[in-house]
Amino acid sequence: MLRSHGRSNPAFQIGAKTVSVDTAPPMAKHTLFTGSTAAWTAAGLGLAFAAHRLKRDLDTPGRPWKDGKTVGREYDAWTEEKILEHYWGEHIHLGYYSDDDLAKGAGTLLGCKVKDFIEAKLDFCDEMLAWSECPDKPAKVLDVGCGIGGTSRHLAKTFGSGTQVTGITLSPKQVERATELAKEQNLPNASFRVMNALEMEFPADTFDLVWACESGEHMPDKRKYVEEMVRVLKPGGRLVIATWCQRSTPPAFTEEDLVNLDYLYKEWAHPYFISIEDYASLVEGTTTMRDVDTNDWTRQTIASWRHSIWAGVWDPIPVFSRPNIWYKTLRDIVCLERMRRAFGRGLMQYGMIKGVKVKASR
């Protein structure tokens, strides 16, 4: 081992002989420092290349919509991984933040202690229900795109045992988990089925309330999606939809807008989005609905995107302890942030649509 006495005098090995840098031949000094510089340069270039490659990969959407099975498989995987359930709880949708919540910093890194992420989702359900103006005790409720059944069970608890809530999803794993949680929570009035929302197996005029929270994003035919929900709704029943929407046009989308929308379509298996106004037109176009109304809840929900990221910062162990999901989680974080920015600059909007059915379906 080499030791230094007093002033630093670097040394290196030539053959079996240790040579001081100060007394080394000029060519040896040149070789030493040139080699070190080359090594550091190569390392720097390697890191730069790796960073460029990673950014390119993260900016390239990797989970495009292909068919309904694509959506079912994605949610099957998320359900089995349990990471989404750990951070998002039983509700796979955004939360609701009042002006007072936002003023206190809810949804920020430190604001995670102001309002719990899962609490925000329960608040969303209650606010959506109030906005729907649904009668107090509907006999039958349909939850379209129910996930693992968080909202279905919340509605079953809210309305009581006299209300039967049915949730449908394309994911068999979600139905399994939703059913398991309903049994654990002693909620026999909440049931779940694997079913395509575009081809529902229910008779016309069945439900008093049809509830669709963040399921329209995955629908390849928005018109059919709306028409099917209206078909199974009873006369006098209420339809309420919460969904991510792209802004209306004009003005036309810029090239940057189109690039961002393409990413948001293809990273989380969305065929396409439509505007809030387009949804209202589809509901009105069924000719059996009245009192169609809309709202934009971007302000009330936008904090959710980063809130979900900060929840992981405060509680990273579930991800760090499972290296096999690091990359997928990183991709999801990137998409969450890109969603937040798209909503923040008005490219995306959080659409709320409701209406009352006035006559029976043919």
Where are these regions (language model features)?
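N-terminal auxiliary segments of SAM/dcSAM-dependent transferases
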Residues: T31-Y87
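Conserved alpha-helix/loop element of class I SAM-dependent methyltransferases that forms part
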Residues: Y96-T108, I118-A139
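Class I SAM-dependent methyltransferase SAM/SAH-binding core
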Residues: K140-L142, I148-E199
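A short acidic, Gly/Pro-enriched loop at the edge of an enzyme's catalytic core
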Residues: L198-V210
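A short SAM/SAH-binding and catalytic strip from SAM-dependent methyltransferases
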Residues: D208-D221
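A short glycine-rich, Lys/Arg-flanked "PGG" loop and its adjoining helix->strand segment in the class I
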Residues: R223-R238
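Acidic carboxylate diad motif detector
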Residues: I241-T243
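Substrate-binding/catalytic lobe of Class I Rossmann-like enzymes that use SAM or dcSAM, i.e.
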Residues: A252-Y350, V358-K359
